[in-house]
Swiss-Prot record:
A Pfam cross-reference name: ApbA_C
Organism classification: Eukaryota, Fungi, Dikarya, Ascomycota, Saccharomycotina
Other observations noted: Present with 2180 molecules/cell in log phase SD medium.
Presence of the UniProt keyword Phosphoprotein in the record: yes
Descriptive protein name: Styryl dye vacuolar localization protein 3
Organism: Saccharomyces cerevisiae (strain ATCC 204508 / S288c) (Baker's yeast)
Span list, region Disordered: 472-503, 538-664, 750-825
Compositional bias per record (Basic residues), positions renumbered to this chain: 809-825
Domain of life: Eukaryota
Modified positions (Phosphoserine) in chain numbering: 471, 551, 662, 757
UniProt subcellular location: Cytoplasm; Bud; Bud neck; Cytoplasm, Cell cortex
Biased composition (Low complexity): 480-489, 604-616, 750-759, 774-788
């Protein structure tokens, strides 16, 4: 806008203010500002003359404070040329006038919206600090109402002139001053341009006529419109039917006419009596069938009622002239309370339309509830349907699960039957391959030179589910089964029944383990007796002294001997230490084993197939000879460290045998020495390759007879010694010995000390004495014998002396006595 533009400010919520604003915003040379409670700057108005107009105000503010703040931020002037204002109450009007001080000056022209109000100009001047400011009033008979938020409408009436009045209401003078007339003339031209088709009336530049026009517009609004609200009537023609309304109408009309005439207003005949006023008021709304603007705004609550300015200002004016107005005061009090009720501030009363709204809201909520209930019912039906489907699926799943379980059980039963059949076939094949021992063996063969008895009383127990490995010559054919082939029938039996047969298989496995333990103990005992017999024989061969009665101490077995004993079973591989006399205590047996020169010694270290219980063996009676040719039943120990496998073929000279007075069994290891891998089907002892092993040593080359000797210790152990190639070979002529039989073979030895090649057959009944009846007893604690200590302290020179005796062919003193003579010297 240029500096020549007219700055106009419109303030208030009165519908007439917006009507004026709608016309001013069309002018191009007017800088328009608007202030009201609406937060929106878009407005819409419908009039009979200008039609429907929708516009947006650029400079719209919600309060004077916001306006002054915005103006102060701009560099332009903050003073307005024209201000059109209204207020809902006298107090707010005074406050608004005081706030305008910063945006007005002496040239500012203020127009008060006074349609239906009386003489507000002096009240505004008193509130302003500038008493010389020109304050005018503007009023119109146009019925402009607010029908909605920021929406206004013109309600036409045939009884009205549709005129805008400009002027100043004063009761002291009749004519305006020349300056006021000039200003009013200028504004008349301005409004005439802006409000075309509407009359602009200056009331002949007379303040009395302008005051009279104010009263004409205000009498019906003061006397009749509030009574419609009080009696809850919308149609003006129904007010006179109320009996109580007639005295109120009479009293109010009388008081208003009195005050108007007292102030100098000139009322015509149509406005100076009660009947004419009431008739004119009814006719003004007869064609529209609409209530008056005050009643309309009260019902729709769209805009303030302005009760304070309408009634209280009249009461104050009457009081200024000393006129009593009890009806008017009563009406003001009642309408003030009704306005509080209408705004919802009452404690006891509410509007019926609020109840209607509540009922409508309740009905709407009920409809929503019914819709939601229907939806809930539908969802519940879906839920029940889904539950039924879920139950059907669960039943079907259960049936399928039961079918699968039955199929699985049938498969397990079939598998168990197949495994049991395979196991029975395997057991049958094993029993078919197991030879039985001849029952008609003579009693003389029950005790062999090896010291291993035939234990027939535990034969059945040993035959029950015991397997120590396949025979080195012949093995059973493989068993065809539906299950994967195992390494051995025993491991297949243990694994298959352990997985499928439950408690019965566990009991069977425990029984097998017990049998294995007992069998291993018997094997260890057998090997211990074999070692003792070997040591005794070697001791007798190395020492040709006078036989002496041995003291029978307990055999103290060391850890290395136990490991050698386990090596004989094939669990630990080859024997790691030589079986020398230094590893044992004093020999406890004086039995002499016969020899057979035709049977060479051999030692295939195989896994023993059957263990038997140790029993006393027969002693062989040989006639005593001279001291020189008599054989001692004591072991020939030239040097305890020189005891080796080369002395196994040396038989004693004395054929007489002495039985043990006591047989030590306390030192025999009874622990469970199970093999490290039970699933292996062969437990054969690998061939000993350790050069320190006693069984790998060959006999001394100084022996008179080089015929190899063979001694069978048990059905599964055979020692073969060759003098030519210094190694142990597996005999190719080994018999096919079953795992569950104990075979005793005759053992023959060649006499290496005598020149004669006579042999003694120990199987001859003439040379076998019956077994002694000596009771076997063992001391509670093992003790070391003197011969064991002597064997540990022997020097290597003994072996040298013995070798010299063999090489020279000259009979020399025994190494044992020679060592003692040297020590005496």
């Amino acid at each position: 806008m240029s500096s020549s533009s007219l700055r106009v400010l419109a303030i208030g919520n009165n519908p007439n203010i917006l009507f004026y604003t709608s016309r001013f915003q069309l002018a191009k040379n007017i800088d328009l500002y608007h202030v009201n409670d609406s937060k929106s700057c878009q407005f819409e108005i419908e009039t009979e003359y200008y039609g429907k107009d929708r516009f947006e105000l650029e400079n719209h503010f919600t309060s004077i404070e916001h306006l002054t703040e915005a103006l102060s931020s701009k560099s332009s002037e903050a003073v307005f040329d024209i201000i059109i204002m209204s207020a809902p109450s006298l107090q707010e009007l005074s406050s608004l006038a005081s706030k305008l001080t910063s945006i007005i000056d002496s040239n500012t022209k203020i127009f008060l919206e006074s349609s239906g109000f009386i003489q507000l100009e002096p009240f505004v001047k008193l509130s302003m600090e500038s008493p010389h400011v020109n304050v005018f009033s503007i009023l119109t008979d146009l019925d402009i109402r607010q029908i909605g938020p920021n929406h206004f409408k013109h309600f036409p009436s045939t009884a009205k002139e549709n005129t805008i009045y400009l002027g100043e209401s004063k009761s002291s003078t009749e004519k305006y001053s020349s300056g006021v007339i000039t200003l009013l003339t200028t504004f008349e031209k301005l409004f005439a341009k802006l409000f075309s088709n509407i009359k602009i009336n200056l009331c002949n530049f007379s303040s009395i006529e302008f005051l009279s026009q104010q009263w004409k517009l205000a009498i019906s609004r003061i006397c009749f419109d509030p009574l419609l609200i009080m009696f809850e009537q919308e149609n003006p023609s129904d007010l006179d039917q109320q009996i109580i309304a007639k005295p109120l109408i009479s009293g109010l009309v009388t008081e208003i006419i009195t005050v108007a005439k007292t102030m100098g207003a000139r009322l015509n005949s149509s406005h100076d009596n009660e009947n004419s006023l009431l008739s004119l008021w009814k006719n003004s709304y007869h064609s529209t069938n609409k209530p008056p603007a005050l009643v309309y705004h009260f019902i729709h609550q769209t805009t303030p009622l302005n009760i304070d300015i309408l009634l209280l200002q009249t009461i104050l004016l009457a009081d200024d002239f000393g006129i009593k107005t009890p009806y008017l005061e009563f009406l003001y009090s009642v309408l003030s309370q009704f306005e509080r009720l209408n705004s919802g501030k009452s404690k006891w009363f509410i509007r019926s339309d609020e109840k209607t709204q509540i009922l409508q809201s309740l009905q709407k909520s009920q409809k929503n509830e019914s819709a939601l209930q229907t939806q809930i019912t539908s969802l519940q039906g879906q839920i029940s349907k889904l539950r039924q489907e879920l139950l059907m699926q669960a039943k079907q799943h259960e049936m399928e699960t039961n079918e699968l379980k039955e199929k699985h059980q049938v498969a397990l039963k079939a598998q168990a039957q197949a495994q049991a059949q395979a196991q029975s076939q395997a057991q049958t094949s094993i029993e078919a391959l197991t030879p039985t021992e001849a029952t008609n063996q003579s009693d003389t063969n029950e005790y062999k030179a090896t010291g291993t008895p035939n234990l027939r009383d535990i034969e059945d127990m040993a035959l029950y589910s015991v397997n120590y490995g396949d025979s080195p010559v012949r093995s059973p054919p493989p068993v065809v089964s539906s299950q994967p082939q195992m390494n051995s029938p025993l491991s297949s039996h243990s694994q298959t029944f352990g997985e499928n047969n439950g408690t019965n298989d566990k009991l069977l496995q425990e029984r097998e383990l017990q049998l294995r333990k007992k069998e291993l103990e018997l094997q260890e005992r057998e090997l211990e007796f074999q070692k003792r017999a070997l040591q005794q024989q070697r001791f007798n061969n190395s020492n040709n002294s006078i036989p002496r009665k041995p003291s029978f101490p307990q055999l103290q077995q060391s850890a290395n001997v136990r490991s050698n004993s386990r090596g004989m079973h094939g669990t630990n591989g080859a024997m790691s230490q030589p079986a020398s006399a230094g590893n044992f205590v004093d020999p406890i047996s004086s039995s002499i084993a016969a020899y057979d020169p035709q049977q060479p010694p051999s030692l295939p270290l195989q896994q023993p197939q059957q263990s038997v219980q140790v029993q006393p063996f027969h002693s062989h009676s040989i006639k005593p000879t001279s001291r020189k040719n008599r054989n001692s039943n004591m072991p020939n120990i030239g040097n305890p460290s020189s005891i080796n496998m080369s002395d196994f073929g040396r038989p004693p000279n004395n054929s007489s045998q002495t039985r043990l007075n006591s047989m030590p069994t306390h030192s025999i290891v009874n622990q469970n020495r199970l093999r490290s891998q039970q699933s292996k089907n062969k437990l054969n002892m690998p061939h000993a390759t350790n050069p320190n092993n006693t069984f790998n040593q060959v006999p001394a080359p100084s022996l008179n007879n080089h015929v190899p000797t063979q001694r069978q210790f048990s059905s599964s152990t055979m020692i073969e010694v060759t003098n030519n190639n210094n190694k142990v070979n597996n005999s190719s002529s080994n018999p096919d010995i079953s795992t569950n039989s104990v075979v005793h073979n005759a053992m023959q030895f060649t006499n290496t000390n005598n020149n004669t090649s006579s042999t003694v057959d120990i199987n001859d009944p003439k040379n076998i004495a019956p077994p002694p009846t000596t009771s076997v007893s063992a001391p509670s604690t093992p003790t070391l014998s003197s011969s064991s200590q002597m064997a540990n302290m022997a020097s290597p020179s003994t072996d040298n002396g013995d070798n010299e005796e063999k090489n020279g062919g000259k009979k020399k003193r025994f190494g044992l006595f020679k060592k003692k003579n040297k020590s005496k010297k």
